[in-house]
């Protein structure tokens, strides 16, 4: 009996030794809604009048400068509890106005220190709020960028315009990864428009993986829905349990964060919603009994809860500290909290050729939508200039 016991101990010791010899690299990928990151100048053809010096928010250089400082502080702090001095390799953003605000944001000392760069394509949103990606070139190499439009269905107004899906293709840890950033329509118009969005993102993910089967896809954004809602759980097919995820599904780690732990990223009437999600394709998962570290795999997710992001007093104590509320400038951050996921990969493992990393071409329906949006943009700009 003793001999068997000591033999078992020897096997366990060997396993621990082998395990200890393996070293893993960790990469963080984040998302953060910037809550109206506007500059102080009018963009021709855009309804950005609230965010001008004479607008309802009295948006001036002082407030814009504080906003840039605050958001860059939060972005640079994301994931640094786990990865001190490194933070996120890639961060998706929503509610940014244009290239100028992204240039100014990345020039802030907190982000400039890590050489963050950005990807952005102007979208058709009439207010001028878009999605973007910032990234550290030392960790993520960009290969291709496209903004795939939201195409209205026959049940919707043919001229319904909203933010599309910003796809950024590149190399992370030498592997082909595509990040899709979305900001789905608000809740004011009912759930259907977001369910359409979820289905279109799923179709885009499938097109990407049909072109590049080994590509790993990360969908992120302000979904204006919780993980439990139909747009996410059914239309996007984002499941809460790794063991439930089939080849045509995705994994949503935030489902249980909300349902089991009651945590969220956006407080409404005293209750938390979790709109800010980062969702993963199946090839980023290790299912039960499989521990493959030779390629990038999901490790964990975290809501980023830096203390300075919260109200510490008053009626909304415990909620997010916004830039403005009730017409009052609070010199805060955002009405949303940032989120991050962590991926791991064993060091020293050879990586397969990632291929060209190019994104799929636009469909005919997408091309038509892009052309229509461009004509509408030109008409708005002409009318705007005529008023001046």
Label for each model-derived stretch:
Residues 90, 96-176:
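Structured beta-strand-rich core segments of catalytic domains in phosphoester-bond hydrolases
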Residues 21-29, 38, 139-141, 160-185, ...:
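Beta-strand-turn-beta hairpins that frame and shape the catalytic cleft
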Residues 20-21, 205-217, 225-388:
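Metal-dependent phosphoester-hydrolase catalytic domains
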Residues 20-109, 119-129, 315-317, 344-388:
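N-terminal, active-site-proximal structural segment of metallo-dependent hydrolase catalytic domains
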Residues 35, 97, 185, 223-226, ...:
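Catalytic metal-binding/acid-base residues of hydrolase active sites
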Residues 98-100, 126-128, 187, 224-230:
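Active-site environment of divalent metal-dependent phosphoester hydrolases
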Residues 1-24:
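Bacterial Sec-dependent N-terminal signal peptides
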Residues 28-31, 89-94, 117-120, 131-135, ...:
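Structural recognition of the beta-strand scaffold that forms the well-ordered cores
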């Amino acid at each position: 009996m003793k001999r068997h016991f000591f033999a078992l101990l020897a096997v366990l010791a060997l396993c621990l030794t082998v395990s200890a010899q393996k070293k893993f690299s960790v990469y963080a990928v984040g998302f953060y809604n910037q809550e109206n990151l506007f500059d102080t100048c009018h963009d021709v053809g855009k309804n950005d009048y609230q965010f001008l010096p004479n607008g309802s928010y009295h948006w001036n250089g002082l407030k814009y400068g504080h906003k840039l400082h605050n958001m860059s502080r939060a972005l640079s702090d994301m994931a640094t509890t786990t990865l001190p001095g490194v933070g996120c390799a890639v961060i998706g953003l929503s509610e940014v106005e244009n290239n100028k605000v992204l240039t100014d944001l990345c020039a802030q000392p907190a982000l400039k220190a890590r050489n963050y760069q950005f990807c952005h394509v102007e979208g058709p949103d009439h207010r001028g709020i878009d999605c973007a990606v910032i990234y550290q070139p030392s960790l993520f190499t960009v290969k291709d960028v496209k903004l795939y439009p939201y195409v209205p269905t026959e049940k919707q107004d043919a001229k319904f315009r909203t933010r599309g899906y910003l796809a950024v293709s590149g190399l992370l840890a030498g592997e082909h990864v595509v990040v899709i950033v979305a900001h789905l329509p608000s809740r004011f118009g009912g759930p259907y428009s977001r369910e359409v969005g979820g289905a279109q993102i799923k179709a885009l993910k499938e097109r990407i993986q049909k072109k590049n089967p080994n590509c790993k896809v990360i969908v992120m954004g302000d979904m204006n829905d919780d993980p439990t809602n139909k747009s996410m759980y059914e239309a996007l097919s984002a499941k809460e349990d790794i063991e439930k995820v089939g080849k045509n599904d995705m994994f949503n780690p935030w489902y249980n964060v909300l349902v089991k732990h009651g945590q969220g990223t956006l407080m409404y009437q005293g209750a938390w919603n979790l709109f800010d999600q980062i969702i993963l394709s199946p090839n980023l998962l290790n299912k039960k009994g499989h521990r493959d570290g030779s390629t990038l795999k999901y490790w964990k997710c975290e809501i980023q809860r830096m203390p300075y992001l919260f109200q510490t007093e008053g009626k909304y104590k415990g909620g997010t500290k916004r830039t403005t509320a009730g017409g009052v400038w609070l010199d805060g951050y955002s009405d949303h909290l940032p989120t991050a996921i962590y991926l791991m990969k064993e060091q020293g493992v050879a990586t397969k050729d990632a291929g060209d990393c190019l994104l799929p071409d636009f469909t005919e329906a997408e091309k038509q939508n892009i052309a229509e949006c461009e004509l509408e943009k030109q008409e708005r700009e002409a009318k705007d200039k005529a008023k001046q």
